[in-house]
Amino acid sequence: MSQPKRRKLESGGGGEGGEGTEEEDGGELEVAVPRPRRTRRERDQLYYQCYSDVSVHEEMIADRVRTDAYRLGILRNWAALRGKTVLDVGAGTGILSIFCAQAGARRVYAVEASDIWQQAREVVRLNGLEDRVHVLPGPVETVELPEQVDAIVSEWMGCGLLHESMLSSVLHARTKWLKEGGLLLPASAELFVAPISDQMLELRLSFWSQMKQLYGVDMSCLESFATRCLMGHSEIVVQGLSGEDVLARPQCFARLELARAGLEQELEAGVGGRFRFSCYGSAPMHGFAIWFQVTFPGGDSEKPVVLSTSPFHPVTHWKQALLYLNEPVQVEQDTDVSGEITLLPSQDHHRHLRVLLRYKVGDQEEKTKDFAMED
C-alpha cells in the first residue's frame, strides 16, 4: 500500500529562525525544519567532494578552448619554466602539472584537496613523470612544500569568474610559496558585462500565446505567470549565448592582477564598476550577461594567450552568467542603459557568488536587484 503523499513547505521568509509551516495531505502532517547552517569547514569538504567524481574533470578537460589555452599558455612560457619549480593549485587529474613538466620544469608540486589526487598520481606515473611531478594531497592552505617555487599555475575560475573559484587559495599560495617576482599562470583576469536579449527565453515567454493557434485553446493569460517564474527570481542563470543576443558593445568593469598586493581584501569588499551602453536596435531586453577572460603572459617575444568566455567566441563549459530583469523591457536603437555592478562573496557561503546590480533603462526609474548563485 502506498504511503499518503505529503508536501513539505519551506520555513516562512527563508530567514533564520522563521517558523516552519505545515500542510495536511492524506491525514498526515509534516513540519519543515530549517536546515542548520554548515560551518566553513563543512562547506569546504562538500566542495572538495564534488571534485572527487570523474564527470567534473571530464567536462573541464573536454573543453578544448580551456585546455588548449592552458597548454599553450604554459608552453609559451617554457623559457621561464625550464629548470624551475612550479606549484599547481587544485591540480585535479594532473594534466596542467604534466604540461609544466613538458615545458621543462624541474619539479612540479601538484596539490589537490579532493580524492582525485589518487588518480592524478596514477596519471603522472603512466606518463613516466613521477620523479618530477609530486602529487600532494590536501588543501593548499595546509600542505607544506619543501621549497619556495618559481611559478604558480591554477585553473581557479568559476562561473562568472568568482563562483566557487579557488582564487583565495591561489592568493594564499602566492603569498606563502611564490618567490618574489615569480610567474603566475594566468596572470590577470577581466570581467565584462553587456545588456542582452535572450532568444531562448523569449521563445519560452511567448509559448503560451501560440496555444490558441496550435490547439484552439487561448492560454495567453499564462504569459505573465511565465514571466514571473522565469525572470522574477534572483538566481544567476548559467547559460550559453551567441553574439546575436548581445544588445550593445560589451564593457570591461573590473580587472584583477593576481600579483597585486591587497587583492584578497578587494575581493572580500566586492569588485565591480559602473557601465553605460547605447543599444544597437529594437529588441526586448531581458537582462545582463557577465563573462570573463584570463591572460597568460607571452614569455620571450611571444604573444600573450587569452582564454575568453565571451559569447562572441567559441562556447566554454563556463558559458555566461545571466542576470535577468523582473520582466522584459523594450529597447530601441540608441536607448541608454546605465548602472553599476558589484561581485562579492555570498553572506551564507564564502565560495558562492553574489551580484549586486543597479540599472536604469531609457527613461525608466533606476532599479536594483540582488542576485545569488544557487547550489
From Swiss-Prot:
The enzyme class is: transferase
Q: Where is the SAM-dependent MTase PRMT-type domain?
A: 44-374
Q: Which family does it belong to?
A: Belongs to the class I-like SAM-binding methyltransferase superfamily. Protein arginine N-methyltransferase family. PRMT6 subfamily.
Q: What is its main location?
A: nucleus
Instruction: Name the residue ranges with Acidic residues bias.
Output: 19-28
Write down the EC number: 2.1.1.319
Residue sites binding S-adenosyl-L-methionine per the record: H57, R66, G90, E112, E141
GO MF annotations for this entry? Answer: chromatin binding; histone arginine N-methyltransferase activity; histone binding; histone H2AR3 methyltransferase activity; histone H3R2 methyltransferase activity; histone H4R3 methyltransferase activity; histone methyltransferase activity; protein-arginine N-methyltransferase activity
Which InterPro entries is this protein grouped with?
Arg_MeTrfase (IPR025799), Methyltransf_25 (IPR041698), PRMT_dom (IPR055135), SAM-dependent_MTases_sf (IPR029063)
User: Where do the segments described as Disordered lie?
Assistant: 1-36
Q: Where does the protein end up? A: Nucleus
> What reaction does this enzyme carry out catalytically?
L-arginyl-[protein] + 2 S-adenosyl-L-methionine = N(omega),N(omega)-dimethyl-L-arginyl-[protein] + 2 S-adenosyl-L-homocysteine + 2 H(+)
Gene3D superfamilies linked to this entry:
Hnrnp arginine n-methyltransferase1, Vaccinia Virus protein VP39
Q: Which residues carry this modification: Asymmetric dimethylarginine?
A: R38
Its job: Arginine methyltransferase that can catalyze the formation of both omega-N monomethylarginine (MMA) and asymmetrical dimethylarginine (aDMA), with a strong preference for the formation of aDMA. Preferentially methylates arginyl residues present in a glycine and arginine-rich domain and displays preference for monomethylated substrates. Specifically mediates the asymmetric dimethylation of histone H3 'Arg-2' to form H3R2me2a. H3R2me2a represents a specific tag for epigenetic transcriptional repression and is mutually exclusive with methylation on histone H3 'Lys-4' (H3K4me2 and H3K4me3).
Per the record, residues carrying Phosphothreonine are T21
Q: What is this protein called?
A: Protein arginine N-methyltransferase 6
Q: How does it assemble?
A: Interacts with (and methylates) HIV-1 Tat, Rev and Nucleocapsid protein p7 (NC). Interacts with EPB41L3 and NCOA1.
| Modification comment | Automethylation enhances its stability.
Q: Name one GO cellular component term.
A: nucleolus
**UniProt keyword terms in alphabetical order:** Chromatin regulator, DNA damage, DNA repair, Methylation, Methyltransferase, Nucleus, Phosphoprotein, Repressor, S-adenosyl-L-methionine, Transcription, Transcription regulation, Transferase
Residues of the active site: E155, E164
For the biological process aspect of GO, one term held by this record is: cellular senescence
